[in-house]
Curated annotation (Swiss-Prot):
InterPro entries: Coronavirus_NS2A, NS2A-like. This is Non-structural protein 2a. Belongs to the coronaviruses ns2a protein family.
Amino acid sequence: MAVAYADKPNHFINFPLTQFQGFVLNYKGLQFQLLDEGVDCKIQTAPHISLAMLDIQPEDYRSVDVAIQEVIDDMHWGEGFQIKFENPHILGRCIVLDVKGVEELHDDLVNYIRDKGCVADQSRKWIGHCTIAQLTDAALSIKENVDFINNMQFNYKITINPSSPARLEIVKLGAERKDGFYETIASHWMGIRFEYNPPTDKLAMIMGYCCLEVVRKELEEGDLPENDDDAWFKLSYHYENNSWFFRHVYRKSSYFRKSCQNLDCNCLGFYESSVEED
């Protein structure tokens, strides 16, 4: 089957960099050099890495959102990984830094998003980069500007591990920027997101098949398979591995949340009294 490409993209997967203060300090130093030299350019105010271009519609947001969470949950951190920024140069009309260390993350995002039936990545080869500024046509034609840019130096590394402030976001092309960040459709911290820890090793210790229909009614249509065996397997797997779907159900279903908190099945009488949140 032919692969569909986002050659006319309307969204992208964003890796924001503003929260990495050491990087931003050095990044702004480059921008100040350009301004001091009098290079006519538009400064980038939201430093970031575009990890994948997308051609999606609003009805695809949830699928892409889930794909991002799955990529994060399936990451093998080890000692973490480094992102290297170097070699300021001109790419098209932009002044950019080469970015190394996120190639595997790019590939995973594209593959997971495509697995959801959404269009990701372009037909041309993806080049990891971070834009510093955009040149005007006049500035691009001045040899002194080009020579100055080609002689600029930059070398910086960011270490990404589970405690880093790294995030993956869905951003619409042309989105507003504020305080160094893009307005996002969805944004997820990349760390090991044990915000909702399972209270026991086995879901069966607190729930039975009789509870599934109650949980299903509180979720969005299609979240849990209609077949109880399939639904039980899906919920149990994600519960025991503390994966994205367990946290989704925990947030969406007050009944499931209360069952986890009580370490017991309380489906009998659920409709007789309201569930109070702790």
